[in-house]
Amino acid sequence: MIHMDIVSLAWAALMVVFTFSLSLVVWGRSGL
């Protein structure tokens, strides 16, 4: 159970970082 929690937490963190970096790139391309 704890292993599953760690995996799900890692996936959530990965998605947050991915979306954050993606939005940052989009902002930079649009000309901040």
UniProtKB/Swiss-Prot annotation:
<dbReference type="InterPro" id="IPR036143">
    <property type="entry name" value="Cytochr_b6-f_cplx_su8_sf"/>
</dbReference>
<dbReference type="InterPro" id="IPR005497">
    <property type="entry name" value="Cytochrome_b6-f_cplx_su8"/>
</dbReference>
<keyword id="KW-0793">Thylakoid</keyword>
<keyword id="KW-1133">Transmembrane helix</keyword>
<dbReference type="GO" id="GO:0015979">
    <property type="term" value="P:photosynthesis"/>
</dbReference>
<keyword id="KW-0249">Electron transport</keyword>
<dbReference type="Pfam" id="PF03742">
    <property type="entry name" value="PetN"/>
</dbReference>
<keyword id="KW-0812">Transmembrane</keyword>
<protein>
    <recommendedName>
        <fullName>Cytochrome b6-f complex subunit 8</fullName>
    </recommendedName>
</protein>
<keyword id="KW-0150">Chloroplast</keyword>
<comment type="subunit">
    <text>The 4 large subunits of the cytochrome b6-f complex are cytochrome b6, subunit IV (17 kDa polypeptide, PetD), cytochrome f and the Rieske protein, while the 4 small subunits are PetG, PetL, PetM and PetN. The complex functions as a dimer.</text>
</comment>
<keyword id="KW-0472">Membrane</keyword>
<dbReference type="GO" id="GO:0045158">
    <property type="term" value="F:electron transporter, transferring electrons within cytochrome b6/f complex of photosystem II activity"/>
</dbReference>
<comment type="similarity">
    <text>Belongs to the PetN family.</text>
</comment>
<keyword id="KW-0602">Photosynthesis</keyword>
<dbReference type="GO" id="GO:0017004">
    <property type="term" value="P:cytochrome complex assembly"/>
</dbReference>
<dbReference type="GO" id="GO:0009512">
    <property type="term" value="C:cytochrome b6f complex"/>
</dbReference>
<keyword id="KW-0813">Transport</keyword>
<feature type="transmembrane region" description="Helical">
    <location>
        <begin position="6"/>
        <end position="26"/>
    </location>
</feature>
<keyword id="KW-0934">Plastid</keyword>
<dbReference type="GO" id="GO:0009535">
    <property type="term" value="C:chloroplast thylakoid membrane"/>
</dbReference>
<comment type="function">
    <text>Component of the cytochrome b6-f complex, which mediates electron transfer between photosystem II (PSII) and photosystem I (PSI), cyclic electron flow around PSI, and state transitions.</text>
</comment>
